[in-house]
Regions:
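Active-site catalytic motif of lipid deacylating hydrolases and related acyltransferases
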Residues: 1-36
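C-terminal catalytic-base region of ester-bond hydrolases, centering on the histidine
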Residues: 80-167
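A general structural motif
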Residues: 35-37, 61-63, 84
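Alpha/beta-hydrolase-fold catalytic nucleophile elbow
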Residues: 67-70, 90
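Conserved hydrolase catalytic core segment
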Residues: 52-64
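Gly/Ala-rich beta-loop-alpha elbow adjacent to hydrolase catalytic centers
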Residues: 41-46, 50
């Protein structure tokens, strides 16, 4: 099953978000299907919301993998949620140009000490399509590795999911 939520959970921005609503719905899903692993993905403020949603989850429910892509939020610390079995974090470490004002103002998390993997992308480097990595185009930070030596967040999450799917 797949569920998509607006970056603020359908609320009114960062001060009146609905991350709590998402957390309740996810907890219900995890309790209904206790052996089914969950992959929770968030980009920008959605990354911050994903961490908050994960923080509110029961540790005993279904296994949870957390992926954050260039997470942004000054009001929340990027502390590892207890229920996250695996946390992958990708972020833009530099560059980004003029259009990167939102994450700079909002407070880009960057490297998260509690994450199992931190993939740092340079805004001066180009993705496979030849475009500069940027906050407003998160897909390359999910599907591409930052260098030849690493795997992508998507590949890492797929491996985690494969290990956690019931027989």
């Amino acid at each position: 099953a797949t569920a998509y939520y607006h970056w603020d959970g359908g609320g009114c921005g960062v001060f009146f978000d609905r991350c709590g609503k998402i957390a309740v719905e996810l907890e219900e899903l995890r309790r209904r299907y206790p052996g089914l692993p969950v992959v929770l993905i968030g980009h920008s403020y959605g990354g911050s919301c994903a961490v908050e949603v994960a923080r509110r989850q029961s540790v005993q429910a279904a296994p949870l993998c957390l992926l954050t892509i260039d997470a942004v939020a000054r009001r929340q610390k990027s502390v590892r949620p207890a229920c996250a079995e695996w946390w992958g974090n990708a972020y833009l470490r530099d560059g980004g140009g003029f259009m990167d004002a939102v994450p700079r103002i909002g407070g880009r998390w960057g490297h998260c000490a509690g994450a199992d993997a931190n993939l740092a992308f340079s805004g001066y480097s180009r993705d496979r399509k030849g475009r500069l990595y940027s906050h407003r185009r998160p897909a390359p930070m999910l599907y591409e590795p930052p260098g030849e030596e690493a795997c992508s967040l998507f590949q890492a999450a797929a491996s985690w999911l494969e290990r956690n799917l019931p027989d």
